[in-house]
């Protein structure tokens, strides 16, 4: 009965949704005890390659063999999902856009929702199937919608990977099914995962444990067990093939700190989940953001060639700095002005920066902006002054 709940979901009397799962997914629990490893300690993770990254700064907090090229299985789908999110942002498509399944999309093996050629679903429904159940047919249907063909979509995937600096990645398909030369790294997966979670919409799908399609006839259960069992989980994607073994890109957020943990080539399904959990525990236990304020309240800065000798300025922004909880808080701020600040000046012009340093390293800067307009001192302005002086006599 338990096996049926996780691995076999009713579509009709004849078909069941095929999903990434196995007996050990069901019978072996995820470790519940939190990892309390400190910085410098080694994490016991049973996988060939893994990484922990803070997605905004792209700072690597822990890694092992993170640049080794490996097969990613369905973690590949992070890139198609990113391209779909970007297409929605551009208003090229909407969640209500209807997609008609092609014969090619319906021919996919592996995880699938058994789309029939000519069957129609909305982008919203196909996203559910792709994110929650890792459905290959749904993913290809989305790719064909955006690029006209899977081949064209894969070209877009590789182009976007290059733009993101994923230098060790080559996609051969959009599903992650094993193919010669279809390779990436844990580091590159962390980069594209970081980009995907900038889109809050993805979390509408990646945080869901169970959902359904076809008016409730087709049940979906998330292949990412952390969604149910790990506090703060926000997604993201599992992957399993005979070559790639067990893979996971997992995202979680606690107390304003969001992290991306990637595990590639685990020997068992729970190796990937326990590995990601250990990485996330390590990050949350050892790192946090510190907010540094500019604290440059309204003041004046001398300028050249203006009707006034000084302009009012201020800097009221903040810089959020990712620091280890044991790291030195040796934070210093230095005010640096642009050279030869001359009129005319417009309100909002950037005239300098408050530079934030930790030790010798610059870790952020905050703009110093003009609070007013200042005209250039020219002939017409001078002539106007003279006239004002005459009429004031």
Which stretches of residues belong to each language-model region?
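A generic local structural motif
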Residues: 7, 36-38, 247
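Domain-terminus/edge residues, biased toward the C-terminal soluble/receptor-binding domains
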Residues: 166-170, 178-393
């Amino acid at each position: 009965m338990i096996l049926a709940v996780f691995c076999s979901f009713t579509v009709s009397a004849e078909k069941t949704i095929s999903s990434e799962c196995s007996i050990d997914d069901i019978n072996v629990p995820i470790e519940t005890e939190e990892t309390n490893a400190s910085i410098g300690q080694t994490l016991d993770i049973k996988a060939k390659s893994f990484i922990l990254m803070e997605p905004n700064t792209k700072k690597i907090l822990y890694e092992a063999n993170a640049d080794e090229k490996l097969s990613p299985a369905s973690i590949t789908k992070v890139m198609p999902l990113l391209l779909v999110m970007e297409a929605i942002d551009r208003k090229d498509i909407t969640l209500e856009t209807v997609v008609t399944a092609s014969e090619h999309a319906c021919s996919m093996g592996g995880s699938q929702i058994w789309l029939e050629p000519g069957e129609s679903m909305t982008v919203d429904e196909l996203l559910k199937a792709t994110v929650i159940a890792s459905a290959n047919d749904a993913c290809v249907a989305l790719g064909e919608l955006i690029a006209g063909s899977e081949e064209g979509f894969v070209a877009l995937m590789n182009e976007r990977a290059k733009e993101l600096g994923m230098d060790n990645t080559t996609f051969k398909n959009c599903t992650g099914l094993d193919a010669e030369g279809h390779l990436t790294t844990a580091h590159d997966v962390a980069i594209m995962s970081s980009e995907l979670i900038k889109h809050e919409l993805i979390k509408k799908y990646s945080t869901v444990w169970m959902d359904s399609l076809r008016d409730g006839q087709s049940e979906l259960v998330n292949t990412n067990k952390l969604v149910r069992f790990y506090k703060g989980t926000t997604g993201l994607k599992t992957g399993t093939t005979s070559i790639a073994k067990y893979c996971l890109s997992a995202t979680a957020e606690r107390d304003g700190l969001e992290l991306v943990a990637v595990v590639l080539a685990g020997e068992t399904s729970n190796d990937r989940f326990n590995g990601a959990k250990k990485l996330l525990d390590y990050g949350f236990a050892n790192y946090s953001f510190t907010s540094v304020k500019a604290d440059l309240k309204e003041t004046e800065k001398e300028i050249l060639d203006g009707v006034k000798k000084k302009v009012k300025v201020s800097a009221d922004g903040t810089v959020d700095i990712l620091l280890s909880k044991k790291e030195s808080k040796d934070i210093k701020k230095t005010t640096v002005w642009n050279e030869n600040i001359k009129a005319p000046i417009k309100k909002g012009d950037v005239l300098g920066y408050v530079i934030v340093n930790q030790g010798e390293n610059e870790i952020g800067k905050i703009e110093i902006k003009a609070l007013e307009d200042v005209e250039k001192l020219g002939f017409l302005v001078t002539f106007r002054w003279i006239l004002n002086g005459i009429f004031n006599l």
